[in-house]
C-alpha cells in the first residue's frame, strides 16, 4: 500500500525543518514533538518518519523518550546518527518498526547485510543523493557511488530504501522526476521518496512510477500542502 508519510525532525527536543539539512538554517520550529505526531495521526497518518537531527550531527541518539512515545501512536521509521547496531536494536526495543541507515550502509556493507538478514523487513537503507552521487555523514561528504549502485548492494535482501534528493530537500521546489523514476524502476525492493515534494502532482508521480510512498516535511509545515489532501493519494488510482 502506497503511503504518504509526514516527517518529524527532532533537534534539541523540538520539531524543526532545516533548509537542505543545514544545522543553522531552521525554517520551522515547534516545541512539542508528541503533539505534532498526534496531530498527524489524528488526520490519518499510518506511518511517521522520525529523524533525530541532534543524533545525526553528533553521531549518537539523543531523543529516546520522545521516539518511544511516538512509536506507540503509529508505524514509525527512525533515522539520524545511527552508526551502531546496538542503537538500532535499542530502537526496536522502544517499538520502532524500521531503522534507517545512511553512513553505515556505505562504510560497513557486510555488517549491515548481516544485520538486515537478522532483522528482515526492518532495515531501511538511506540513499541520500547530491548531484547524482551518494552523500554520507550528515550529508557533509560525497562518495563515488551512484544511488542505484548503493542500493544494489542490498537489493537482494528484505530491506526498503529511502531515496532523498538533497539538492531540493527543504526547498519546497518540486522533485527531480527522471532520477526518482530511474531509482524506483531499477530496484526490486520498496523505495520511499523524499526531498522537495511540494504538490499533489509530485505525490501522484511517485505513486505512478512505483514508489512505495513519499516522505513530506517542509511542504506540510509551511502549509504549501495540506496533509488531508495529500493522504487521499494513498487511495487514488493514478
UniProtKB/Swiss-Prot annotation:
Main location (coarse class): cytoplasm
EC number: 5.3.1.16
Subcellular location: Cytoplasm
One example GO MF annotation: 1-(5-phosphoribosyl)-5-[(5-phosphoribosylamino)methylideneamino]imidazole-4-carboxamide isomerase activity
Record keyword Protease present: no
Transmembrane segments annotated in the record for this chain: none
InterPro entries referenced in this protein's UniProt entry, alphabetically: Aldolase_TIM (IPR013785), His_biosynth (IPR006062), HisA_bact_arch (IPR006063), Isoase_HisA-like (IPR044524), Isoase_HisA-like_bact (IPR023016), RibuloseP-bd_barrel (IPR011060)
Cellular component, GO, one term: cytoplasm
Pfam families on file: His_biosynth (PF00977)
EC class: isomerase
Residue numbers annotated as active site: 9, 128
Gene3D superfamilies: Aldolase class I
KW Membrane (keyword) present: no
GO BP annotations listed: L-histidine biosynthetic process; L-tryptophan biosynthetic process
Catalytic reaction equation(s): 1-(5-phospho-beta-D-ribosyl)-5-[(5-phospho-beta-D-ribosylamino)methylideneamino]imidazole-4-carboxamide = 5-[(5-phospho-1-deoxy-D-ribulos-1-ylimino)methylamino]-1-(5-phospho-beta-D-ribosyl)imidazole-4-carboxamide
UniProt pathway annotation: Amino-acid biosynthesis; L-histidine biosynthesis; L-histidine from 5-phospho-alpha-D-ribose 1-diphosphate: step 4/9
SUPFAM superfamilies xrefs: Ribulose-phoshate binding barrel
UniProtKB keywords: Amino-acid biosynthesis, Cytoplasm, Histidine biosynthesis, Isomerase
Similarity comment text for this entry: Belongs to the HisA/HisF family.
HAMAP family, A to Z: HisA
Designated name of the protein: 1-(5-phosphoribosyl)-5-[(5-phosphoribosylamino)methylideneamino] imidazole-4-carboxamide isomerase
Organism: Archaeoglobus fulgidus (strain ATCC 49558 / DSM 4304 / JCM 9628 / NBRC 100126 / VC-16)
Amino acid at each position: 500500500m502506497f503511503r504518504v508519510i509526514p516527517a518529524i525532525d527532532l533537534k534539541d527536543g523540538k520539531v524543526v525543518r532545516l533548509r537542505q539539512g543545514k544545522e543553522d538554517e531552521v525554517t520551522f520550529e515547534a516545541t512539542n514533538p508528541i503533539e505534532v505526531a498526534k496531530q498527524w495521526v489524528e488526520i490519518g497518518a499510518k506511518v511517521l518518519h522520525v529523524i533525530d537531527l541532534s543524533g545525526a550531527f553528533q553521531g549518537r541518539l539523543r531523543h529516546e523518550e520522545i521516539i518511544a512515545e511516538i512509536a506507540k501512536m503509529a508505524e514509525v521509521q527512525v533515522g539520524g546518527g545511527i552508526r551502531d547496531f546496538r542503537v538500532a536494536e535499542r530502537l526496536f526495543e522502544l517499538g520502532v518498526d524500521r531503522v534507517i541507515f545512511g553512513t553505515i550502509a556505505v562504510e560497513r556493507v557486510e555488517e549491515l547485510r548481516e544485520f538486515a538478514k537478522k532483522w528482515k523487513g526492518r532495515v531501511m537503507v538511506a540513499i541520500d543523493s547530491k548531484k547524482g552521487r551518494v552523500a554520507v555523514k550528515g550529508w557533509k561528504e560525497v562518495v563515488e557511488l551512484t544511488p542505484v549502485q548503493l542500493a544494489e548492494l542490498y537489493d537482494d535482501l528484505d530491506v526498503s530504501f529511502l531515496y532523498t534528493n538533497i539538492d531540493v530537500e527543504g526547498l519546497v521546489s518540486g522533485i527531480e522526476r527522471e532520477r526518482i523514476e530511474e531509482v524506483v524502476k531499477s530496484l526490486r525492493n520498496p523505495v520511499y521518496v523524499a526531498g522537495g515534494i511540494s504538490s499533489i502532482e509530485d505525490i501522484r508521480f511517485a505513486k505512478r512510477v512505483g514508489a512505495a510512498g513519499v516522505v513530506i516535511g517542509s511542504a506540510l509545515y509551511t502549509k504549501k500542502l495540506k496533509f488531508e489532501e495529500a493522504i487521499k493519494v494513498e487511495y487514488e488510482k493514478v
